Amino acid sequence: MLTRYKMTMAYDGHLFHGFQLQPDQRTVQGTVEDALKKMTKGKRIIVQGSGRTDAGVHAIGQVIHFDYPGKEIPANRMILALNSMMPTDIVFTDCQIVDEDFHARYSIKGKWYRYRLSLDYFVNPFKRFYTGHFPYQLDLEKMRIAAQDLLGKHDFTSFAASGGQIKDKVRTIYYINITKDEKENEIVFDFIGSGFLYNMVRIMVAALLEIGNERRPLHDLRRVIAAKDRQEVRQTAQGSGLYLYHVFYDEIPQKYRQDQYL
């Protein structure tokens, strides 16, 4: 008998070599699978994630699932057991027993990524692993206007880093919000979409920064999208500022459907 568990987790990614299991490297998937192996006295339980965050990238709302053998453990006990075995840079925040047709990756309706960018002139030693850094002049209003050109369904080849294995580069961006956190002297970017290509959020942030810094024309992203050429945006924002914030398994709420008003 197998019981499928859906679990939401947060992790500080700066000491992990990404989410996905890699030989002889510290990864999020490997850490969780090691704990499950101890719980089952040596059985390999494969953990499926909603996506593969890169080295140094963080998560507030990563979702995983796995099939646990033997007697069903109540969800409240499973989360206690796993959290007791996690290092201090991982915590599980929710646990549910779900039907076997639920899949952490293939049941997704959308994802929400957040990017935090420090505007401090010098790199803050307490932020260096948790924000990007851009100590230059930025026009936020221009960035907000330019971001509207990314909304909707497009081929995002120009915003996909080489090395990605997915051939279909068409994605839908539902929502983009760019705000200033005056207290922290940071800009916060929020992106909600049907899915995101390899490094896509970080490349979009880099392009918007070029517009905000007046190194790229206001509506140049329309041309960039049409070009379908990665060389059109050569910069990629630092991974330290990126957070997988939330994964949607129900329809995207209407308040996040800016694409419907284009």
UniProtKB/Swiss-Prot annotation:
Active-site residues annotated for this sequence: D54 (nucleophile)
Keywords, alphabetical: Isomerase, tRNA processing
Catalytic activity of the protein: uridine(38/39/40) in tRNA = pseudouridine(38/39/40) in tRNA
Database matches in InterPro entries: PsdUridine_synth_cat_dom_sf, PsdUridine_synth_TruA, PsdUridine_synth_TruA_a/b_dom, PsdUridine_synth_TruA_C, TruA/RsuA/RluB/E/F_N
Single annotated GO MF: RNA binding
Positions contributing to substrate binding: Y113
Enzyme nomenclature, EC number: 5.4.99.12
The keyword Isomerase belongs to this UniProt entry's keyword annotation: yes
Gene Ontology terms: biological process: tRNA pseudouridine synthesis
Enzyme class: isomerase
CDD domains named in the record: PseudoU_synth_EcTruA
Subunit structure, interactors included: Homodimer.
NCBIfam families xrefs: hisT_truA (TIGR00071)
Family indicated by similarity: Belongs to the tRNA pseudouridine synthase TruA family.
Record's function text: Formation of pseudouridine at positions 38, 39 and 40 in the anticodon stem and loop of transfer RNAs.
Protein name per UniProt: tRNA pseudouridine synthase A
Organism of origin: Lactobacillus acidophilus (strain ATCC 700396 / NCK56 / N2 / NCFM)
Phylogenetic classification of the source organism: Bacteria, Bacillati, Bacillota, Bacilli, Lactobacillales
